[in-house]
A protein has these predicted regions:
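Membrane-interface "cap" regions at the ends of multi-pass membrane proteins
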Residues: 2-63, 207, 245, 271-277, ...
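Flexible loop linkers connecting adjacent transmembrane helices
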Residues: 24-31, 65-69, 92-117, 142-156, ...
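Transmembrane-helix boundary/entry motifs in multi-pass membrane transporters
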Residues: 35-39, 73, 100-130, 147-150, ...
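Transmembrane helix-boundary motif of multi-pass solute transporters/channels
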Residues: 45-86, 90-93, 102-103, 138, ...
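Juxtamembrane transmembrane-helix boundary signature
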Residues: 52, 79-110, 121-135, 184
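Selective recognition of specific alpha-helical transmembrane segments in multi-pass small-molecule
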Residues: 80-90, 94, 215, 251-254, ...
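Transmembrane alpha-helical segments of multi-pass small-molecule transport proteins
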Residues: 122, 149-189, 204-212
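Hydrophobic alpha-helical segments and their helix-loop junctions in multi-pass secondary transporters
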Residues: 181-185, 205-235, 243-248, 252-263, ...
């Protein structure tokens, strides 16, 4: 039944039944191992949660973390973990249903609720994917222009706007990213090696971001009492704009397009009822942990380098590219901006 319902998904035709059964046997044996051994075994098999983590670590979360750290210091450290915890709970429930039934969620929504609900869900996914892509391209263009300035190419027009080189760099990086995304999307799932390379590429990029800001945090020091209050104090500053920053961070943590992608990525990996424990570990280690680490380190780094406790205002005009300033004291102006 499950195999019939997942027929036609890009990776389904490439399942190796014997390999899948070996994986199930290995997962069952992992359940009786010590915690660290079990965690290592699950970590090697993660995947769908990693896609969600990479998908949500975009311009929205970056901007919210930069503004939170630069405007309020450690105070709003609690927001991102709470936001992602809510998302993980939703994905865990969604994954449990999908792995139990092995059924595609779109027809299930149409049957159990109404076809119009399923259609609106799919439509919302498409609209959200388009809308949320605009800030990603804006962030990439801003970073590309910053690197061009570093290389001596003027991109900002003193009279306002950008120079011809600035527009060329902006549209060039946009076209490059679009081409890479199209190539990756059409080829993802074409063979097992490509999938593993793609997932390890995501791990490497996320790991680089974590390492970069971890170095800044270590070098600039941590106020442990403020850190504790930031994570567990659940304070909301009375400053104008604080509530907007909190709501923006929560809204950027998980999108409706992720709720559509996640169940299909589970089915396309060949996961079923025997993979429920792996799916929970995947959400915890590949989605929750990287997201919280990255956003928390960005907030702490901005709090240590940019935050001015005497300002008492929300820095709405600060941009994610400005997070590079947090790396300057440790890595220098040039390397900090490149990283």
């Amino acid at each position: 039944m499950a195999a019939q319902q997942t027929k036609g998904l890009p990776m389904t035709a490439r399942w190796d039944p014997e390999k899948l059964q070996r994986e199930i046997d290995e997962l069952q044996s992992l359940e009786s191992r010590p915690f660290l051994s079990r965690a290592g075994g699950y970590l090697k098999r993660t995947g769908p949660g990693l896609l969600q983590s990479a998908m949500t670590l975009g311009a929205g979360s970056a901007a919210a973390s930069v503004v939170a750290g630069a405007s309020f210091g450690y105070t709003l450290l609690w927001v991102q973990p709470i936001a992602m915890f809510l998302g993980v709970c939703m994905f865990a429930a969604l994954g449990n249903v999908v792995l139990t039934t092995g059924e595609r969620p779109y027809p299930a929504f149409g049957r159990e609720l109404h076809k119009s609900v399923a259609f609106l869900w799919a439509l919302g996914t498409i609209v959200a994917s388009v809308i949320w892509h605009f800030p990603q391209y804006g962030l990439a263009a801003g970073a590309a222009r910053d690197l061009a300035e570093l290389g001596g190419i003027p991109t900002a027009d003193p009279a306002g706007g950008f120079t011809a080189a600035g527009y060329l760099v902006s549209f060039g990086i946009g076209a490059g990213i679009l081409g890479l995304n199209i190539f990756t999307t059409w080829n993802y799932g074409s063979h097992a090696r490509g999938i593993k390379l793609y997932e390890w590429f995501l791990r490497s990029i996320i790991g680089l971001v974590i390492l970069s800001f971890a170095v800044v945090v270590i070098k600039t020091g941590v106020n442990w009492s403020e850190l504790s209050r930031g994570f567990f104090g659940f304070q909301l500053p009375g400053t104008s704009g604080a509530a907007t920053v909190v709501l923006g961070a929560i809204g950027a943590a998980v999108g409706i397009n992720m709720t559509f992608l996640y169940p299909y990525s589970l089915l396309a990996k060949g996961w079923g009822a025997h993979h429920k424990a792996l799916a929970r570990w995947d959400l915890a280690m590949s989605m929750f942990l990287p997201f919280v680490l990255v956003t928390s380190l960005v907030i702490i780094a901005m709090a240590n380098t940019v935050y001015d406790p005497t300002a008492q205002r929300t820095l709405h005009d600060i941009k994610p590219v400005d997070a590079a300033q947090a790396l300057v004291p440790v890595m220098g102006s040039s390397l900090g901006r490149i990283i």
